[in-house]
């Protein structure tokens, strides 16, 4: 299926001396009838697999992680892309079987309206993740949070800072009781030279990481903090070395 989406996203490179074309605005991709038929068939196959999944297999995966000292608090299932209510229900069943208390997806008002009843049904949270939305004029998470107490934020402090330049603690102080988890990464701000809003090695960017962590520690707020590795890794390193505890302390 990804081949179709890559074709839609591809953009001709600029010729020597030409100015690169402006990035395409992302919208619903257009497919030929044959491509759409193949996509629809694939979706039905995925739906059948999901609804027929034996949850004992998920519980087995949870045990493997638990035995390795890893606990799961949130699962990225993206119910916004699921075509049926049965699949949305499946998302919460799987997350619960993994030991998580929340499912996450991209922040969106319509998704919140659709998914909130399922989160309430399972006694879980729908925790919405952000990219650059807070930098968009007029955007607010308030209407989304107002839908249900089961709606929470999976607040990406790095993307928030990188796109707005605003200290993440302003958001955290205001919404700490509606923030389930926080994504932490180091980035440059939106006005930084020729590399604005760019991922950096932990501790080498402009994101006020220490401030965020100290605030949560001092206030004793029960918020999960997840460190994300999103920058390009040098050839002499790897993801394990970059994520080593000594590297981020």
Could you say what each language-model-derived stretch is?
Residues 51-55, 59, 85-89, 109, ...:
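Non-membrane alpha-helical structural segments and their capping/turn regions in soluble enzymes
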Residues 22, 32, 36-38, 43, ...:
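Active-site acidic/histidine proton-transfer and metal-coordination neighborhood
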Residues 6-22, 29-31, 38, 44, ...:
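Histidine-acidic metal/acid-base catalytic patches
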Residues 1:
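Mature N-terminal segment immediately following signal peptide/propeptide cleavage
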